[in-house]
UniProtKB/Swiss-Prot annotation:
Positions with a binding annotation for substrate: S67, N118, E162, N169, Y193, Y245, V263
PANTHER family: GLUTAMINASE (PTHR12544), GLUTAMINASE 1 (PTHR12544:SF48)
Annotated S-S bridges: none
Domain of life: Bacteria
One Pfam short name: Glutaminase
Keywords: Hydrolase
UniProt source species: Brucella abortus (strain 2308)
Keyword Hydrolase: yes
Protein name: Glutaminase
Family classification: Belongs to the glutaminase family.
Record gene name: glsA
HAMAP family: Glutaminase
Reaction it catalyzes: L-glutamine + H2O = L-glutamate + NH4(+)
Lineage of the species this protein comes from: Bacteria, Pseudomonadati, Pseudomonadota, Alphaproteobacteria, Hyphomicrobiales
Length: 317
């Protein structure tokens, strides 16, 4: 169902109201940089599959992409080795556990289950093409820039803040490596993964990146193909299964769209063939998802009738 400009503008107002009225949560405090971001920031954006952009609030304030980056590194690797190889090497199942848990690794002989949790994302980073760590990182950055339709940059402040506190991810990488499921030097994989989480984006960027998936892999602003049409569906499936971690059930009920969150406060949701919704607000719930952003995206999706599990209109009996 295609949404008119007026409908999207009205939905944004409803989303803004829902986001601003949502309370609770706190900034991620285990990464020093994230703890220092003003908690009252809130932005919301929609970009359609034909390139129309709508936004409100702090939609052009930059923040750390964090785990939302996993989607785009997955796209890069899927283009390189194909979805079947990704499933074999990284996995394609929900864990039902926190995003940084090692329990799933122990239960599955050191193999990750999903490219959208930390273990699988580190394994995915180890599969990025390139002869050196810098070459692999540059490939990731160029991929992110292509999805956003503009030049993005690494925040040295975010990267340093994370590199000095990522001991848990280093342990995960060594567990993967010991099981033969980290496909490069494990510390190089963690370094690349940490860098990919440290680029700066806006809610408008995230909506554009999501709209690229909604448009079958072609950026609707630049016209550049970023991922083959056949690889879009597997990416959206991964987002559906693991994009919001242990809050996935609530998300499926209230939003009903493929989505991905990050502890920087961003959330991106994709309506295949139509548009993408993105929101940003730093305070997080216990699962690591932005309280205000979740409420805002849910309100926009509901207003536009874009919950994929809801039947609209008359149904024949």
């Amino acid at each position: 169902m295609s949404s008119s400009s007026d409908a999207i503008k009205a939905a944004l107002e409803k989303g803004r109201a829902a986001g601003l009225s949502a309370t609770g949560g706190k900034n991620a405090d285990y990464i020093p940089f994230l703890a220092s971001v003003p908690s009252d920031l809130f932005g919301l954006a929609v970009v359609t599959a034909d390139g129309q952009t709508f936004k409100t609030g702090d939609a052009d304030i930059a923040f750390a992409i964090e785990s939302i980056s996993k989607v785009f590194t997955l796209a890069l690797v899927m283009e390189e080795i194909g979805p079947d190889s990704v499933r074999e090497k990284v996995g394609a199942d929900p864990t039902g556990l926190p995003f940084n848990s090692v329990i799933a690794l122990e239960l599955h002989n050191g193999k990750s289950l999903s490219p959208l949790v930390n273990a699988g994302a580190i394994a995915t980073a180890s599969l990025v093409p390139g002869d050196t760590a810098d070459a692999r990182w540059n490939n990731i950055l160029e991929c992110q820039c292509g999805f956003a339709g503009r030049r993005l940059k690494l925040s040295n402040e975010v990267n340093q803040s994370e590199q000095t506190t990522n001991f848990h991810n280093r342990a995960i990488a060594w567990l993967l490596y010991s099981a033969g499921t980290c496909y490069s030097d494990p510390m190089e994989a963690v370094d690349i993964y940490t860098r990919q989480c440290s680029t700066l984006v806006t809610a408008t960027d995230l909506a554009t990146m999501g709209a690229t998936l909604a448009a079958g892999g072609v950026n609707p602003i630049s016209g550049k193909r970023m991922v083959s049409a056949g690889n879009v569906a597997p990416i959206l499936v991964e987002m559906t299964m693991e994009g919001l971690y242990t809050a996935l059930g609530d998300w499926a009920y209230t939003v009903g769209l493929p989505g991905k969150s990050g502890v920087g406060g961003g959330i991106m949701a994709v309506v295949p063939g139509e548009l993408a919704i993105a929101a940003f607000s730093p305070p997080l719930d216990p699962a690591g998802n932005s309280v205000k952003a979740m409420a805002a995206v849910a309100a926009v999706a509901d207003s536009l009738g874009h919950n994929l599990y809801t039947t609209r209109g008359k149904v024949s009996s």
